[in-house]
Amino acid sequence: MTTAPNNGLPLTFTLWKDQTPFTGQALPGLPRLTVYLPSEELNSGKAVIICPGGGYGMLSVPKEGHRIARFLGSQGHAAAVLEYRFAPYSHPIPLIDAQRAIRTLRHQAVEWRIDPAQIGIMGFSAGGHLAGTAATFPRIEAGLVHDAIDSESSRPDFAILVYPVISLTHPCAHLGSRDNLLDKHAEQDLAEQLSLENAVTAQTPPTLLIHTNEDTGVPPENSILFYQALRKNKVPAALHIYEKGAHGIGLAANHPWGKAMLQWLDNR
């Protein structure tokens, strides 16, 4: 795949050219990536892969995907909306999709005028859990097709987690996301491993966390847990908890988190 988006129009393609690993009859056409490139005059060289939310049971693509990508593009950042597989697919399938997306952007970096050392991942709600998993978990070897894309690193250079699901075991856990992500026969140990406050290391990339105090769907304790783990491991991190805003706020009009994100990106 060597085609680049033209005339400011996005380019959509499936992540694997031929056979998608672990594919089944569900969710035909997924996983796929839609890439938005900024104008040459504004291009910062940074790229952000966006994982929409949806509790690992659907994807909120318009609000937490394409709208975010267009916003980032207007500010000079490349963006790619990842439509990853969700239930009935369970872990590690969404993570395999996210890692392939990161490797794909890195493989296309020269053609798409992206700095391969400035590729980050962003996620909302359960998509924030997926982005956080990509930022903390090692490369998944299962399902690799060993093409030129798979030779690239799957580690993101930064992460932006917006009202993310973090824990699958803490009282603040979002049980719907946990039930959709984990096979019903999964051991408790796997839920502990996928509680991302337990997965942070000194190698975790710099992370921005966004949450609101009014979020009752995924309480802000999720972001607090992750931030505390980042601090413990001396990972550069910023946490913004705003007073107003319900869960799933997206880029609501006049909400300040979008501006805070751009400022944080400028400092990377």
What are these regions (language model features)?
Residues 100-173, 191, 196:
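Primarily recognizes the serine-hydrolase "nucleophile elbow" in alpha/beta-hydrolase
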Residues 203, 209-211, 215:
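Short beta-strand/loop motif that positions the catalytic acidic residue
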